[in-house]
């Protein structure tokens, strides 16, 4: 029961993870499509989960969960995340969000958080969000499926929240979109992830519309979110 409660704590929007500052590309999409609605949001969430999170961030998180607290192995997973993130705004955002989450856990005295911060400062690690999540949540006692479920939920709920804050959909419509994609998140969170050697960590993702929108968003004069 404790691990479930800790999972709820980590997934809670009130938990200071720093994710409120990031829209996962949704602000750029909305700016380019005034007709963006609930159906558009569901399609976007589905694409994020199926074509980026499933085989990129989720895989990195699971591998980091297994590797913790080995900083060398975590650093190689971080390097794979860096290589897989083609858009600078998303790449930098991942590191910034990872740093924010880690700072909170350092202040909460989560086991291993100080060592993770030292590994990032000294060089073996870059501190991408998925890597930090996997290492920290293992230290809290979350299982691999629990950690994946929390990360998947944070991705979709954070994207929904950003869309609501942008005024593009209402709160009820946002929750309808969230409900529509949760079964997909649950199914993917339970998929097995094979162990991969350091020289063969493969993270794949293909979300071109979101990535193009994020690149345009990075040059916008007025922005509510960091990406």
Model regions: which residues?
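Metal- and O2-centered redox machinery and metal/ROS homeostasis
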Residues: 1-227
């Amino acid at each position: 029961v404790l691990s479930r409660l800790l999972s709820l704590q980590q997934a809670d929007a009130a938990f200071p993870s720093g994710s409120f500052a990031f829209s996962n590309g949704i602000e750029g999409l909305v700016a380019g499509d005034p007709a963006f609605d609930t159906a558009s949001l569901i399609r976007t969430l589905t694409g994020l989960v199926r074509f980026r999170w499933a085989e990129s961030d989720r895989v990195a998180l699971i591998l980091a969960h297994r590797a913790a607290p080995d900083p060398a192995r975590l650093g190689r997973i971080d390097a794979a995340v860096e290589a897989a993130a083609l858009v600078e705004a998303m790449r930098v955002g991942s590191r910034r969000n990872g740093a924010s989450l880690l700072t909170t856990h350092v202040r909460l005295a989560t086991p291993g958080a100080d060592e993770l911060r030292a590994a990032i400062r000294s060089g073996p690690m870059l501190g991408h969000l998925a890597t930090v999540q996997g290492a920290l949540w293992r230290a809290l006692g979350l299982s691999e499926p629990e950690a994946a479920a929390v990360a998947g939920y944070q991705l979709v709920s954070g994207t929904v929240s950003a869309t609501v804050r942008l005024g593009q959909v209402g709160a009820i419509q946002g929750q309808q979109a969230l409900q529509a994609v949760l079964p997909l998140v649950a199914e993917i969170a339970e998929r097995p992830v094979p162990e991969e050697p350091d020289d063969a960590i493969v993270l794949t993702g293909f979300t071109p519309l979101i990535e193009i929108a994020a690149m345009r968003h990075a040059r916008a004069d007025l922005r509510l979110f960091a990406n």
